Swiss-Prot record:
GO terms for cellular component: microtubule; microtubule cytoskeleton. Residues 41-187 form the Calponin-homology (CH) domain. Residues 963-1001 have a biased composition (Polar residues). GO terms for molecular function: ATP binding; microtubule binding; microtubule motor activity. ATP binds at residues 472-479. One of its GO terms (biological process) is microtubule-based movement. This is Kinesin-like protein KIN-14F. Residues 390-715 form the Kinesin motor domain. Residues 718-748 form a coiled coil. Residues 885-904 have a biased composition (Basic and acidic residues). It comes from the Eukaryota. PANTHER family: KINESIN-LIKE PROTEIN KIN-14I (PTHR47972:SF39), KINESIN-LIKE PROTEIN KLP-3 (PTHR47972). Keywords: ATP-binding, Coiled coil, Microtubule, Motor protein, Nucleotide-binding.
Amino acid sequence: MAEAAALFSLSAAAVVEDVLRQHGCRLSDRDLASRRAEEAAARRNEAAGWLRRTVGAVAARDLPEEPSEEEFRLGLRNGQILCGALNRVHPGAVPKACAHVVFVNLIRSRCAVCHCSVMVVVNTAADSVLQPDGAALSAFQYFENVRNFLVAAQEIGLPCFEASDLEQGGKSARVVNCVLALKSYGDWKQCGGTGPWKYGGNLKPSASGKSFVRKNSEPFRRCQSMNEGEVPYEEAGFSGDYHLDSGDMSTSRPLKMLVSAVLSDKRPDEVPQVKAALKNGTDGTKSFSKSKMDTIEVYSKHRQTKKEAYGEVTLKQYSMLQLQSKHVEELKADIRATKAGMEFMQMKYSEDINILGRHLFSLAHAASGYHIVLEENRKLYNQVQDLKGSIRVYCRVRPFLPGQVSSCAVGSIDEGNITIITPSKSGKEGRKTFSFNKVFGPSATQDEVFLDTQPLIRSVLDGYNVCIFAYGQTGSGKTYTMSGPKNMTEQTQGVNYRALSDLFKLAEQRKGAFIYDIAVQMIEIYNEQVRDLLVNDGLNKRLEIRNNSQNGLNVPDASLVCVASTMDVMELMNVGQKNRAVGATALNDRSSRSHSCLTVHVQGRDLTSGTILRGCMHLVDLAGSERVDKSEVTGERLKEAQHINKSLSALGDVIASLAQKSAHVPYRNSKLTQLLQDSLGGQAKTLMFVHISPESDALGESISTLKFAERVSTVELGAARLNKESGEVKELKEQIARLKSSLAMKDSGSEQNINRDPEAFNMKMPSPGFSNRRQGSCELVSSQTNFRQPMEDVGNIEVRANPTLRQKKPSFDLQDLLASNDSPSWPDSISRANFQMGEERVTIGGEWIDKVVVNNNNSVGDWEGDSAALPDFFYQRYHSGTRDKQYLRNNSRKKDGNEFEQQRPRFYSTNTDDSDDIDIATSDSSESDALWQFNVQSINSSISENGSKIKKPQTKLRESSDTRTPLHSQIPSASRKTSNGNRSGRQPLSGSDSRRLSSNGRHAGTK
């Protein structure tokens, strides 16, 4: 029994040594261990997945898809899944029947030497029992299935594992390696099995001595066939002397197995030594055991040292973990406090936002009210401007040109103020501020500029005259504002294009209530010559300006073209821009060398009431003032610059006279001022764009331009007139004109009726085009060829001959005075007011009224005899085909201003306040006609005493054959008019005539 104990002790020592050898080479690197654990888990999952797919989910119900090491071991412990997988890969490799059942008990015991856990195999024989289907398998069936699998796998050449690897504490890595090798073998067979098969996995050979039972050892095979408790020690190398009783060994079967396992690793020549050591207890065995014990002791000490070091590290890590846990708790507390603070701040922010929202709402409400008040103030301001007739002045600053580097002379720009930086003599920077209605900076767009002028432009459709002109030095952007650049786009279109487009849009919106006819003219003033820009030969044709034209045609001979859309306007304006005089100077490569004027005539008719509205809009692009030393012009360009500067100087004189409210305004000093006379004289709403350059080099010109614009803004022209005529008045005037025309035709052949009814000569045959102005595509074009008709107080409207309405005013017609039985005698002197009324009547009456006055005076010549017949040439004058031509030539005569100033003192007792009316009156009627109206009054006062004086001019008339109109020669003291081509000059009164008027003492006076 003692020998058996010694054998067990030796075997236990060998086992402990093997265990130490196994565990001594572990790596201390935890990261490497975790990485290997992850790799092992991945391989295990791959093997489990393949097994489930191979044998089916039902057969592999005990094996999860991603099992742990313990689940993997328990799932494969019965061997059914392994055998099933092997039979699927290699059919018939594992038989299903078992010959007998052997219970194998693996008992875990503790080693007495090192107290480590060891596995002891205990075999117990039992009768052969067949388990029914579905019943739990016995331990023998588990072992038998595993053994059959291992045998078949070894025959195939697969890497095998030990049966103990499937028990608790076994190595599942070798099982996984075997399963993956089987998977690779199955894939090789499915591919055809061509070529040698070799598993490419990580094959680790099993170390000897690590298990109690070896698959190739003879004791393992004998253990399977044992059915009795007796062990064949002879085969194990033991002699017959060392024989244990079966009764004794039956109680220590695990010891047998352990001894067999130990001796199985020994070579045959070592077995006798082991037996001798066990039997005799020799010193060699003791020394061997002692060395083993020393090794174990050293290992134990080393392990204890490592354990202590690990304990210190663990303690340190634990303290650090505690500290970190404390910090985490503190952070959690801070987070909770921060969260509470954020919630409080969010609540406060919500309250503040609500308060700000209420304040913002109140501010928005106040702002909306402010904008409403501002809009009302703007409307009221515009109404005040309209009532005062002030010229609106808008200032625009041109941006710097590309590539231009210069200091800016513009300091600041506000809503209506602009500040210019001016250097002073002391070297300090000075500033001058100018105020206008609106100031546009360099960044202002064309659309912004037009939006402020849009209400003014739209008033044209309401029957008002509008004038917009651009002023400034050359190169300051006048043409850009009015027309646009050379390569024009929709965004860069100027005021001209936008104004006409807006008129068409508004006319389209009002088409249900009004019908509008729109026509345009485009002229230029080049070197004091008026030229038509809408015709190809307009450069060679000279046009005349007639300011008293009642239909807005100040240049009646210019082309008047009807337009119906914006495209028509653009085509016409392109033609006009091509024909305009443009040249290159040192200041501007496209310098305008002329003043251009685009005139838009609008006539509208109210479909409900029949009211006629007429409006006229002048869009004037003035040529820029320039200094010859800067523009470096010579030759023809120099001549152009001189004419431009002269006309702009005349415009400045007119503005100065208007600002000072002078009695005389020199409109006729230039063609430009003569063209703008109606607009500057209070007949229209006027707007001036003043342009300046931002460069410091142009500081002098900019300040001069701004000063001129300030003077313009102070001019008050009076309220603009509304050109409106009701339908009833129009019908009555047409009816009166027709009645007078028919009466004149009936009485023209009766001398007696003419003498009794001189009013018959106050009638003029209406022009066919005038009586039917709606014929043709455009009413305004047809009216261009007609004679201008008289104009009443309603403004520039179409008026038929209506002397009945004129009777509402004090009449100074000689026949009207004589027709009244109880009329008072003619006063010796005429008051200033009555004279102005008479002069207004002459002006408003138009061309044919002047002729009627002369006609009435002819009857005065024969006043002594009521039945006296008039000469034949009198009737020929009013019924000849050349009557209108003579009258037009009469209207186009040039009048010398100095002669008029010399002759006016003879007929005015006092100076008149409105010299413009005199200019208008003398522009279309001959001076002798104006003189005749007052000479007739003088004759009327002394007709009974000086009858011979009336007949004397008639004798002169018969003797003179070069006079234009015979009737004018009957005027007692009128100046003689001689014909000189298309121009006629006035001759001063002869000395006898002057003395004759002075002797009467009626109208002589000094200026």
